[in-house]
């Protein structure tokens, strides 16, 4: 730690009334751009309007003004999030069977949407149990409401109204901090203060207050619910907070108050701050007492972290010092200059944050099934599948976004004249070695992983099962993964002496948790089939990275186009008269990367869906015999391409294809509609601009003949616009098709 003489006090850094609020200005489309504000000459105008409305870099080059716009937009985003949350809670309050579900979560499905009968839609309202007819939801809200201690629809109403108030507050804040009191640039660049507030305030106090809520409200209410007490009989949340005797009846150590804390006799609190591991056999979720303990521990860590950086007092770390000291024997100047990049380029900052958040979101996807955090979540198979799929897609999009903004940083904000021999410069100087090696890895992985399947299909087709790669013939066991599983399964008592069970049942052992005759979780065996598909995962991920990284490293220049930086982030080709230079812009790499991201995530969610139905999910008899949904067919069927098509895609699509006339029929319609949206994208991806321009001019001629030609001249989509429309429909159609396929299947059989 570096201790210096006290630095001068930091002043309040805002400008008062910098920009006047003007509705006339807002009402003028394109007011942010001199060209667009003139109004439309051609139909390209509407595309440019949408493309540039939030591209604040194109409105002004003043970093302070850009920062203020981004800051203000964040409040608008938060407002929308609060509005969305309010809607979710309102549906729970007004249209749901939450109270019925709470009283019997194993026999009643969650529903918070009832379809109005207009022309026969009431068929969509299926019987979810308990006499309630509605659409079964798979968002996990019921489970999280129960975990947080909500026992009535009135409480959901109040929360919904509270969220609306916060939404209004955020809208006001967005206006206030742009028009009334806008921060100066120095405020946005004061990273130590920002770290302190975000770490100690948002994450530290946020986790602490959640831990407090869990201990004082969630735990006692869930104790009562688990014991079968009628929700209407349970005391209200504020009674637990105000009346310590109520809590002391459930957790006797509460009677002693804070004495054990100050006398360091912390083990007294082990009644409600536990370290058990494994799952609660009543609910099939993590022990809520473990979760409360976790949030308390996390809060302490973040509160400490929030006090590590030097602000008004001359004590603590400075980020600039840390970065500049960060150099090894082979890394030249190391991280020197990184501080300046991250405080003057919000694209660089955003890129880093998106990469981290995307990876974290994918980690969340895996934790949601391996360590199901909420009561009765693990036995709600539709919700489990939805949560995994949702978090995988979101993570994939965020990671592609990271590459997009890294490339925008390279094109717009990177200054090669000031960067010499730091890590970024060194990476750029040996980018050819990086990309060519990565390319070799992709070719190797692609041929070998796919080759294993092709071998199996060929042997299977020729009737030679003994020559296939499988658990019963030539084994390719994932020995490293199995070793990691065993290490974790054996951890309790060795590395974690206080824990009674390992972190997740999936690691191994003999434990099985079933709730209401349904499997919540059991050890997940890994075999040859998983070895094969994991190498497909490796292949698709590496190709995605190859495309995205090439886009970033060659964003400013390449051997083909040395002056690429002058052409900008997105451009169709290097001008007329230079063939073979199309699809080289950084934007095009993001465009291509999106398709491979879609590939990668699709294989992951297919693997998950089939593996869980085959080896985990199912029912358990009174004798303890488990019957899995697809009877353990993953290990032998998924080792051929034909098996994936026949026993996964085709066999499991029967529910969505045969859904007509049932309450799942909407999924059947979506399945068809989304296939159409996907196919529609190909029209944009496989056609040239000139073809459409010719057609348009012929149609305009006909309009002129009839004297109904518009004043705005119609234009074909530009190459980039066509690709943008294409990839959007490709992804939207593909994701919605998968959604309909998964949900119709799992709601029918789960």
Curated annotation (Swiss-Prot):
<dbReference type="InterPro" id="IPR001280">
    <property type="entry name" value="PSI_PsaA/B"/>
</dbReference>
<dbReference type="GO" id="GO:0009522">
    <property type="term" value="C:photosystem I"/>
</dbReference>
<feature type="transmembrane region" description="Helical; Name=VI">
    <location>
        <begin position="385"/>
        <end position="411"/>
    </location>
</feature>
<keyword id="KW-0004">4Fe-4S</keyword>
<feature type="binding site">
    <location>
        <position position="692"/>
    </location>
    <ligand>
        <name>phylloquinone</name>
    </ligand>
</feature>
<feature type="transmembrane region" description="Helical; Name=XI">
    <location>
        <begin position="724"/>
        <end position="744"/>
    </location>
</feature>
<keyword id="KW-0602">Photosynthesis</keyword>
<keyword id="KW-0150">Chloroplast</keyword>
<dbReference type="GO" id="GO:0051539">
    <property type="term" value="F:4 iron, 4 sulfur cluster binding"/>
</dbReference>
<feature type="transmembrane region" description="Helical; Name=I">
    <location>
        <begin position="70"/>
        <end position="93"/>
    </location>
</feature>
<dbReference type="GO" id="GO:0009055">
    <property type="term" value="F:electron transfer activity"/>
</dbReference>
<comment type="subunit">
    <text>The PsaA/B heterodimer binds the P700 chlorophyll special pair and subsequent electron acceptors. PSI consists of a core antenna complex that captures photons, and an electron transfer chain that converts photonic excitation into a charge separation. The eukaryotic PSI reaction center is composed of at least 11 subunits.</text>
</comment>
<feature type="transmembrane region" description="Helical; Name=II">
    <location>
        <begin position="156"/>
        <end position="179"/>
    </location>
</feature>
<dbReference type="Pfam" id="PF00223">
    <property type="entry name" value="PsaA_PsaB"/>
</dbReference>
<feature type="transmembrane region" description="Helical; Name=VIII">
    <location>
        <begin position="531"/>
        <end position="549"/>
    </location>
</feature>
<feature type="binding site" description="axial binding residue">
    <location>
        <position position="675"/>
    </location>
    <ligand>
        <name>chlorophyll a'</name>
    </ligand>
</feature>
<keyword id="KW-0812">Transmembrane</keyword>
<feature type="transmembrane region" description="Helical; Name=III">
    <location>
        <begin position="195"/>
        <end position="219"/>
    </location>
</feature>
<keyword id="KW-0411">Iron-sulfur</keyword>
<feature type="binding site">
    <location>
        <position position="691"/>
    </location>
    <ligand>
        <name>chlorophyll a</name>
    </ligand>
</feature>
<feature type="transmembrane region" description="Helical; Name=X">
    <location>
        <begin position="664"/>
        <end position="686"/>
    </location>
</feature>
<keyword id="KW-0603">Photosystem I</keyword>
<feature type="binding site">
    <location>
        <position position="573"/>
    </location>
    <ligand>
        <name>[4Fe-4S] cluster</name>
    </ligand>
</feature>
<dbReference type="GO" id="GO:0015979">
    <property type="term" value="P:photosynthesis"/>
</dbReference>
<feature type="transmembrane region" description="Helical; Name=IX">
    <location>
        <begin position="589"/>
        <end position="610"/>
    </location>
</feature>
<keyword id="KW-0408">Iron</keyword>
<keyword id="KW-0148">Chlorophyll</keyword>
<dbReference type="GO" id="GO:0009535">
    <property type="term" value="C:chloroplast thylakoid membrane"/>
</dbReference>
<comment type="function">
    <text>PsaA and PsaB bind P700, the primary electron donor of photosystem I (PSI), as well as the electron acceptors A0, A1 and FX. PSI is a plastocyanin-ferredoxin oxidoreductase, converting photonic excitation into a charge separation, which transfers an electron from the donor P700 chlorophyll pair to the spectroscopically characterized acceptors A0, A1, FX, FA and FB in turn. Oxidized P700 is reduced on the lumenal side of the thylakoid membrane by plastocyanin.</text>
</comment>
<dbReference type="InterPro" id="IPR020586">
    <property type="entry name" value="PSI_PsaA/B_CS"/>
</dbReference>
<dbReference type="InterPro" id="IPR006243">
    <property type="entry name" value="PSI_PsaA"/>
</dbReference>
<dbReference type="GO" id="GO:0016491">
    <property type="term" value="F:oxidoreductase activity"/>
</dbReference>
<keyword id="KW-1133">Transmembrane helix</keyword>
<protein>
    <recommendedName>
        <fullName>Photosystem I P700 chlorophyll a apoprotein A1</fullName>
        <ecNumber>1.97.1.12</ecNumber>
    </recommendedName>
</protein>
<keyword id="KW-0472">Membrane</keyword>
<keyword id="KW-0479">Metal-binding</keyword>
<keyword id="KW-0157">Chromophore</keyword>
<keyword id="KW-0249">Electron transport</keyword>
<feature type="binding site">
    <location>
        <position position="582"/>
    </location>
    <ligand>
        <name>[4Fe-4S] cluster</name>
    </ligand>
</feature>
<feature type="binding site" description="axial binding residue">
    <location>
        <position position="683"/>
    </location>
    <ligand>
        <name>chlorophyll a</name>
    </ligand>
</feature>
<keyword id="KW-0460">Magnesium</keyword>
<keyword id="KW-0793">Thylakoid</keyword>
């Amino acid at each position: 730690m570096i201790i210096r003489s006290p630095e001068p006090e930091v002043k309040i850094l805002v400008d008062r009334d910098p920009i006047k609020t003007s509705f006339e200005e807002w009402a003028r489309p394109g007011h942010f751009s001199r060209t667009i504000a003139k109004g439309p000459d051609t139909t390209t105008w509407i595309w440019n309007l949408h493309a540039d409305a939030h591209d604040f870099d194109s409105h002004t080059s003043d970093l302070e003004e850009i920062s203020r716009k981004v800051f203000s937009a964040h409040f608008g985003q938060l407002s929308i999030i609060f509005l969305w949350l309010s809607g979710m809670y309102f549906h729970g309050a007004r249209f749901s069977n939450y109270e019925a579900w709470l009283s019997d979560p194993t026999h009643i499905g969650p529903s918070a949407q009832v379809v109005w009968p207009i022309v026969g839609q009431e068929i969509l309202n299926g019987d979810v149990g308990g006499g309630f007819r509605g659409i079964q939801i798979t968002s996990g809200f019921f489970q999280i409401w129960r975990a947080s201690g909500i026992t009535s629809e009135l409480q959901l109403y109040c929360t919904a109204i509270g969220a609306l108030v916060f939404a209004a507050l955020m809208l006001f804040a967005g206006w206030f901090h742009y028009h009334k009191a806008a921060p100066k640039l120095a405020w946005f660049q004061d990273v130590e203060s920002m770290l302190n507030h975000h770490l100690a305030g948002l994450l530290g106090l946020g986790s602490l207050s959640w831990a407090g809520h869990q201990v004082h409200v969630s735990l006692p209410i869930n104790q009562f619910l688990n014991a079968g007490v009628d929700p209407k009989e349970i005391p209200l949340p504020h009674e637990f907070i105000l009346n310590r005797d109520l809590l002391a009846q459930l957790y006797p150590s509460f009677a002693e108050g804070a004495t054990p804390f100050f006398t360091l006799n912390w083990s007294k609190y082990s009644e409600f701050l536990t370290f058990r591991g494994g799952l609660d056999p009543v609910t099939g979720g993590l022990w809520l007492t473990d979760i409360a303990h976790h949030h308390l521990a996390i809060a302490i860590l973040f509160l400490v972290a929030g006090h590590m950086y030097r602000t008004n007092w001359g004590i603590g770390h400075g980020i600039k010092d840390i970065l500049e000291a960060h150099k090894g024997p082979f890394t030249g100047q190391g991280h020197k200059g990184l501080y300046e990049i991250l405080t003057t380029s919000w694209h660089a900052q955003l890129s880093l944050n998106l990469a981290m958040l995307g990876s974290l979101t994918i980690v969340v996807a895996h934790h949601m099934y391996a360590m199901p955090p909420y009561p009765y979540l693990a036995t709600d198979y539709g919700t489990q599948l939805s949560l995994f799929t949702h978090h995988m897609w979101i993570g994939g999009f965020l990671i592609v976004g990271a590459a997009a903004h890294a490339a925008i940083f390279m094109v717009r904000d990177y200054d090669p004249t000031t960067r010499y021999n730091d890590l970024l410069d060194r990476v750029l100087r040996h980018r050819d070695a990086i990309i060519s090696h990565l390319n070799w890895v992709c070719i190797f992985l692609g041929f070998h992983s796919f080759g294993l399947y092709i071998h199996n299909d060929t042997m299977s087709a020729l009737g030679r099962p003994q020559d296939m790669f499988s658990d019963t013939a030539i084994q390719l066991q994932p020995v490293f993964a199995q070793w990691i599983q065993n290490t974790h399964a054996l951890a309790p008592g060795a590395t974690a002496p206080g824990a009674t069970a390992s972190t997740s049942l999936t690691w191994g052992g003999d434990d099985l948790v079933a709730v209401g005759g349904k499997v919540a979780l059991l050890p997940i065996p890994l075999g040859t089939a998983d070895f094969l598909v994991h190498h497909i995962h490796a292949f698709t991920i590496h190709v995605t990275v190859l495309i995205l990284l090439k886009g970033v490293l060659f964003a400013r220049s390449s051997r083909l186009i040395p002056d690429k930086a002058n052409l900008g982030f997105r451009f169709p080709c290097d001008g007329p008269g230079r063939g073979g230079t199309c699809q080289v812009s950084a934007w095009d790499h993001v465009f291509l990367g999106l398709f491979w991201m879609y590939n990668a995530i699709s294989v992951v969610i297919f693997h998950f869906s089939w593996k869980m139905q085959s080896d985990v999910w199912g029912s358990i008899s009174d004798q303890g015999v488990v019957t899995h949904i697809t009877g353990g067919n993953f290990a032998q069927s998924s080792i051929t391409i034909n098996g994936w098509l026949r026993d996964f895609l085709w066999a499991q699509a029967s529910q969505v294809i045969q859904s007509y006339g049932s309450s799942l029929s909407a999924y059947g319609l979506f399945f068809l509609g989304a296939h159409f949206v996907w196919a529609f994208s190909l029209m944009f991806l496989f056609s040239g601009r000139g073809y459409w321009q010719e057609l348009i001019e012929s149609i305009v001629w006909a309009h002129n003949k009839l004297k109904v030609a518009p004043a705005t001249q119609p234009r074909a989509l530009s190459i980039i616009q066509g690709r943008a429309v294409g990839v959007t429909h490709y992804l939207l159609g593909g994701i919605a098709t998968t959604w309909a396929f998964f949900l119709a299947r799992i709601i029918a059989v789960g």
